[in-house]
């Protein structure tokens, strides 16, 4: 800018010259010379850091404004800096008065609350703008109108933290604070348990320079995985080192830091640990203009002398520096809007306020600017920042090069912006719908996972080999194949370890877990790949992937032996009750037929049809004939008894219809009962087990099957659990192998998963599954609760399912040699063992008829005994003479001695065996004699009857 010059020669000083000089000084010089605006800064210093970062940012901003004349073309910004010790409020007040005496337009700093309150009271009394860039304890007195604070409001940050906790669905949170102000900053979160289902545990860090490892050890023991740290970035850097030392820098922990300088820390050691680390960022590095300023700052800092170790990246601009930079720019913008801004010297002891103070304060509060920390606007009432954004950032392993500067590239590489929190609209997570397919293996690639499992055929078995095997090569089976497929998809490595106690995982009465579930809870394992059932109680303490196999509980029992066919198995088609009812029906029908036949007149007939006037009538349906009619119909044989009356024919027809159905049903069932060897089992379902106590039953101790019966509310299963719990030493087994051996050797039924039963029955034909499935469940891959691997494992399992590999693996390990068919498709031929009883019945009938004939013989002999009581032998001969004859005749007898004696019978038999000629001659001679004898016997019997009559 060119400047006007006036030359005044000596001796020419006149009155006009004086007026010209006065005009130049009053009008020309102010328009042509730049205006100077002075601002003051009060900054604390420490012993090892003579110049703090806020002072450097203050100078950097003033220099940038003076170099870029577009903002203040006619004004030069100057500053006065005063340094004080920490927490020295008296020195801060004295230095503030010194700067006000110099005529500063605004005061910046200090940072700590005790000093800032003293300076703020002076500025408020003299009506000078006070600019703050640090968190300040909220003041109860609202009369402090002459200050603004660019640091986000504590209540807003507290709401942002609470929104994130709710978004992540954390049910248990640990808050670790550095000093008492942390409880004020997080009061919205601390009040959360009263409104939300969140448990909050509050802990305090030890004083400065104290070891925090005991606190971290206690947190690790208590399994506190979600931790919020409220501390400075220096403390955060030290805490992270101790967390790494304690082995708590794993993927199961999620740390959130409230400091806005988390992004500026050197976290290279923790990037590949898998830990979840989240924080806020106020710098708007997405803006190219902001990135360029950060690069300039970084270049200047790298050229400066090295600073003490603070854990920050070299040359990184902190949030404090960015806020101070923006604060200086806000004052510059306000001064640019003021046409004339003349600041006079102020004296603290006079209490005379600045004349331009209120106007300048309003200009600052009304200013709008997109600075390094985003859009800046103020609330005119309290001077606090409003409508601001907080970037939500998360630590990651690899990133994309999106920025041009080295510092910005590093920020994009280490941190990922996953959302934005706005003071008005709240939380907006922009990373919720990210493309998983492109980045699915980021956290698993080349990572070695500890896998816990249990020996269980065919899921995990020792590999058979002549050479010693080590590591994962020791094992084979379904779960090892599944692990291999998951590893191929996700790219991780794994180390398989057997669970020490050999149990799946159950909870005792004290709430303590064992088995593989405990391994996951204690984070001694990353995955549990085994036949681990997904249950409600386990889901509360660990996470599960989607099931890779579905199944249910069933009963393993010995195959029943085939029933040996009995000789009377032909009776099996009808139950004993039916046989009895059939016999009773036969007797009943016979009696009814006898009564009706006697009652109806149409069943009586004349035995002498040639003599129609005869008064003698007869009835064929005697009691014995009626019974014989019923038996003949039942046996499907004729009895030569014909009912004549309609009533008796109705009885006969109904009886025939009854016998038709009975015989048809018997015939239909006879084939099945005689040709098929029946397999009878004492139990057919869980209900059968529950109803008896002879067969002992149980499950694997501390397994999901045992837990199912223990927790079940169904009466049948409650009864079964009562049985098992009363006999725990004998009913519950240690593992499946022990249970299978008991099933084979004793009268024991094992309750286990259907897939395991399927495998066992394929290899042992003496075992079988009884009944259907008691429940329905699935096997899943277990992970510690909150594990980042669960979703990736689930996606990989679904991929294997769609490709059919899960089915192929099951076919590979379940397929056995197979067992022979239990039942032949063709009916077997009947043997003596099937129908031998029929021959026994026939023989018994023949023997019975012989004895009945003898009985009839004896009975008739007694009845027809002569009056003159002959001997036993003569009575026998008499009976034979009267009963055994060829045909009736009334001719005379040849004598008693010749009546069909034993010799006559033998003679007749001998004649029949001779030749034809001799047979005819002799038969005529002997036959005539015998025939005459028979007639004589008959005649004598007739005469005796008449005599007796």
From Swiss-Prot:
The modification Phosphothreonine is found at residue 761. One of its GO terms (cellular component) is postsynaptic membrane. The modification Phosphoserine is found at residue 725. Residues 598-653, 856-949 are cytoplasmic. It is found in: Cell membrane; Postsynaptic cell membrane. Residues 1-30 form the signal peptide. It comes from the Eukaryota. Disulfide bonds join 765-819. Keywords: Cell membrane, Disulfide bond, Glycoprotein, Ion channel, Ion transport, Ligand-gated ion channel, Membrane, Phosphoprotein, Postsynaptic cell membrane, Receptor, Signal, Synapse, Transmembrane, Transmembrane helix, Transport. Glycans are attached at residues 68, 74, 276, 379, 428, 439, 446, 561, 766. One of its GO terms (biological process) is modulation of chemical synaptic transmission. GO terms for molecular function: extracellularly glutamate-gated ion channel activity; glutamate binding; glutamate-gated calcium ion channel activity; glutamate-gated receptor activity; identical protein binding; kainate selective glutamate receptor activity; L-glutamate transmembrane transporter activity; ligand-gated monoatomic ion channel activity involved in regulation of presynaptic membrane potential. Residues 31-576, 675-834 are extracellular. Expressed in the olfactory bulb (at protein level). Expressed in subsets of neurons throughout the developing and adult central and peripheral nervous systems. In the CNS principally in the medial amygdaloid nuclei, medial habenulae, pyriform and cingulate cortices, and Purkinje cell layer. Also highly expressed in embryonic and adult dorsal root ganglia. Expressed at high levels in the trigeminal ganglion neurons. CDD domains: PBP1_iGluR_Kainate. Coiled coil: none annotated. Belongs to the glutamate-gated ion channel (TC 1.A.10.1) family. GRIK1 subfamily. Homotetramer or heterotetramer of pore-forming glutamate receptor subunits. Tetramers may be formed by the dimerization of dimers. Can form functional heteromeric receptors with GRIK4 and GRIK5. Interacts with KLHL17. Ionotropic glutamate receptor that functions as a cation-permeable ligand-gated ion channel, gated by L-glutamate and the glutamatergic agonist kainic acid. L-glutamate acts as an excitatory neurotransmitter at many synapses in the central nervous system. Binding of the excitatory neurotransmitter L-glutamate induces a conformation change, leading to the opening of the cation channel, and thereby converts the chemical signal to an electrical impulse. The receptor then desensitizes rapidly and enters a transient inactive state, characterized by the presence of bound agonist. The postsynaptic actions of Glu are mediated by a variety of receptors that are named according to their selective agonists. This receptor binds domoate > kainate > L-glutamate = quisqualate > CNQX = DNQX > AMPA > dihydrokainate > NMDA. This is Glutamate receptor ionotropic, kainate 1.
